């Protein structure tokens, strides 16, 4: 009896029929010359999951598994053909594939958690050297030459919900304002995203935010809540405040005329306190502080993908090839997250990646395959019920 391998198991979360629909919409295979977007996707995901360090290693490793190519729907690859596709092919199909996987993860998260909290941040991706300089020099900053990856992370399961790839000189706030706002959700970000007009839009969308006031914020206190003796060791003050500056920047009118909340907390090991800003006027101060503390999860996410997936050493040197490789890293992370959830979520993502890396072309054992199908069927039933009754 035929049994699928681990690689096929992962790809089931992005069915080829769905992917080919994306390819058709973008007419991405128009000049493919026998090496289509699906071949490119499988090859690049193999590079991410196997940890291939170069195109030569990718070609040798992937082509050594020829008996599995038919069931993956691909043929042996040539590194020159893959390099050419990475340099020239529009990444729009891969962008849409990431969004499709994000939607699949988001549906599952909504069933598991009533309270949505998102973490927003960016991380630089350094690209230096003669082969990168011709397209990275003009947009470099004092700290970074390369690109910047912006991510909105779901705090419940540390999966990306939105992303953007820009030059490093693009302001975080400029990209942050493109994030879709969900009513009832909570958005946590640092003071680099300080913009009262944007805060007002989040408030108008009936969502919440937790961030930090800048040092020069002009505020006047409307109400001070008493600090209990039990909280005095960490909480300095809990106040409702209003913004005093009606023209904060460039003569623009500040639209945020409602009270905000300022929670000032001590930081262990630091001389300065943390001055938090939020439009949540009812939650305990301890919860507000804890929400901001969870922002570190997105720092760990960036550290994880840079350490364990391929976004520090690149297989191509063009802007297009680098962007495609970052997108396939995000796809690999999302596929691993979906597989982990289908298996009950008992393993760390690092342990699962280590197992996948060592057994990428191993056939699943019969009991494994059966239990995977059963769990996936149960997950589909839950999703259908949520669609019907939600």
Describe the predicted segments one by one:
Residues 63, 81-82, 181:
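Acidic/polar active-site rim loop that often engages polyanionic ligands
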Residues 75-135:
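Active-site- or DNA-interface-adjacent structural scaffold in DNA-acting proteins
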């Amino acid at each position: 009896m035929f049994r699928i391998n681990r690689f096929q198991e992962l790809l089931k979360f992005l069915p080829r029929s769905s992917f080919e629909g994306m390819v058709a919409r973008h007419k991405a295979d128009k000049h493919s010359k026998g090496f289509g977007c699906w071949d490119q996707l499988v090859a690049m995901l193999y590079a991410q999951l196997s940890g291939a360090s170069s195109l030569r290693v990718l070609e040798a490793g992937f082509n050594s598994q020829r008996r599995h190519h038919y069931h993956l729907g691909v043929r042996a690859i040539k590194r020159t053909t893959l390099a050419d596709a990475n340099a020239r092919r529009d990444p729009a199909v891969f962008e849409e594939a990431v969004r499709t996987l994000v939607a699949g993860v988001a549906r599952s998260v909504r069933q598991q958690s009533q309270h949505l909290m998102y973490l927003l941040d960016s991380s630089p991706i350094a690209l230096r050297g003669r082969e990168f300089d011709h397209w990275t020099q003009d947009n470099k900053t004092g700290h970074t030459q390369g690109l910047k990856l912006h991510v909105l992370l779901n705090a419940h399961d540390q999966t990306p919900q939105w992303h953007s790839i820009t030059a490093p000189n693009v302001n975080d706030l400029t990209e942050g304002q493109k994030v879709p706002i969900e009513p009832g959700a909570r958005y946590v970000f640092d003071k680099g995203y300080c913009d009262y007009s944007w805060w007002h839009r989040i408030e108008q969308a009936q969502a919440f935010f937790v961030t930090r006031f800048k040092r020069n914020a002009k505020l006047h206190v409307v109400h001070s809540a008493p600090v209990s003796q039990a909280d005095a060791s960490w909480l300095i003050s809990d106040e409702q405040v209003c913004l005093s500056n009606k023209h904060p920047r460039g003569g623009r009118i500040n639209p945020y005329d409602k009270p905000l909340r300022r929670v000032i907390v001590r930081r262990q090991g630091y001389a300065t306190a943390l001055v938090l800003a939020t439009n949540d006027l009812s939650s305990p101060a301890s919860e507000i502080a804890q929400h901001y503390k969870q922002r570190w999860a997105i720092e760990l996410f960036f550290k994880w993908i840079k350490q364990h997936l391929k976004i520090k050493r690149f297989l191509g040197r063009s802007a297009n090839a680098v962007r495609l490789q970052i997108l396939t890293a995000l796809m690999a992370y999302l596929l691993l997250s979906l597989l982990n959830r289908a298996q009950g979520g008992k393993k760390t993502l690092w342990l699962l990646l280590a197992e996948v890396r060592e057994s990428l072309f191993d056939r699943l054992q019969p009991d494994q395959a059966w239990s995977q199908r059963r769990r996936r069927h149960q997950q589909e039933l839950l999703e259908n019920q949520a669609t019907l009754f939600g």
